[in-house]
């Protein structure tokens, strides 16, 4: 079987974009698959993804990264995943897995009472508040899924 880069299929040099423009990136651990995801995010979302990743890495220097279900996940060893994000057509959805414990609460509710969302549209977001949520979330028990 030929070696392939994460998120690339067949002879195509471009990653496959799924529904809403979310990049299809193979499951993987570490920074490399996350960087592949960020590079494949379309248009303005790519710049946003790199900003989110940078804020997370600066705020949580020992952050653990992975790609699962075509989304980058961020966590702390021994505490689980605290955040992920996903591209949609008009925005990027950030999920805080223990977001109901953050102060102030991220604005979006989820079916799971613990989870809170932040939908980021083109044009910017409050980076200071995002960094504060990341810092808080990284200290809380996270999701211990795969």
Which residues does each predicted region cover?
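Charge-dense, helix-prone N-terminal extensions
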Residues: 2-146
């Amino acid at each position: 079987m030929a070696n392939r880069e994460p998120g690339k299929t067949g002879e195509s040099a471009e990653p496959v974009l799924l529904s809403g423009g979310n990049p299809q990136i193979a499951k993987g651990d570490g920074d490399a698959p996350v960087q592949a995801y960020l590079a494949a995010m379309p248009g303005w979302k790519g710049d946003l993804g790199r900003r989110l990743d940078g804020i997370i890495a600066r705020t949580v220097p020992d952050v653990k990264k992975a790609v699962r279900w075509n989304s980058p996940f961020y966590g702390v060893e021994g505490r689980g995943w605290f955040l992920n994000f996903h591209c949609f057509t008009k925005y990027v959805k950030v999920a805080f897995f223990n977001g109901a414990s953050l102060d102030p609460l991220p604005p979006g509710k989820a079916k799971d009472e613990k989870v809170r969302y932040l939908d980021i549209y083109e044009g910017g977001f409050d980076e200071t508040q995002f960094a504060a949520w990341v810092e808080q979330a990284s200290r809380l028990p996270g999701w211990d899924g795969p």
